[in-house]
Amino acid sequence: MNRQKQSFDNCFEVFLADTPETKKIHYELRYRVYCEEVGLEDKRRFPDQQEKDEWDNCAVHFLVRHRYTRQWLGGIRMVMHKGQVFPFQESGVAFERLSRDRYKNSVEISRLCIIKEARRFALRNTSVDVTEESRKISFLHDCGNMNRNIMWGLYRAAAIYSARNGIKHWYTLYNPALASLVKKQGFDVQQVGNASPRQSSREPYYLSVKKILENPLWLEDYRNDFRMYSDIDKEAGRRQVKQIGVVSYVARA
């Protein structure tokens, strides 16, 4: 099997969601996750079926879509501080306040979610001719693997954006399983606080943007740059956004 054809870069593309249309995609995806799938948010609060909050006005959003189907598969946001406060600090976690200078070049990573159809789209409409048995043993063989591939693609795009814009520090909330997954992939993840009763087992972690970009993971794949959706919009005119699928994975913050 030609695995190169099934690399992240050959199957997917990452966009900076810099238009109202693409931000709406993220909000709708989040609604499906947090309101319909997981039930972490009350859907009655979002009659327009867009899960969003006051932090979205000071956030940068990224989306992943499949190159061939144009299906949107996942998203993430980077939140800038507001009054020297990040969203996770309002959740009650035990966390030492950052210095004023530290806030200037830090962000919180949150609202990571990936749809269930990611695995199916990974092998659809590619130039690879694979048998049913080959599909079963493919390196994209389960949703867990695909979730990780898309997660790393989103991380890579967010890290590149961070470096270009003087952002040096990431803060995020992980549960133990997700923290372990990120560590196993070679990322230097440091726990910087403790969970609160409201956050269950999720605890605050720190990642250095410099060290994220030094991860050997990027040497083999994820080499393509993210694209600004507004540039695509200008080239092709208004695109109709495809309906997002059923969500199977979410890391909420």
Task: Please state what every model-predicted region is.
Residues 11-15, 24-28, 141-145, 155-157, ...:
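Short acidic/polar alpha-helix capping motifs at helix-coil junctions
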Residues 19, 67, 81, 117, ...:
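Generic structural motif
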Residues 22, 36, 66-70, 160-169:
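Secondary-structure boundary elements
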Residues 83-189, 193-208:
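Acyl-donor binding region in acyl/amide transferases
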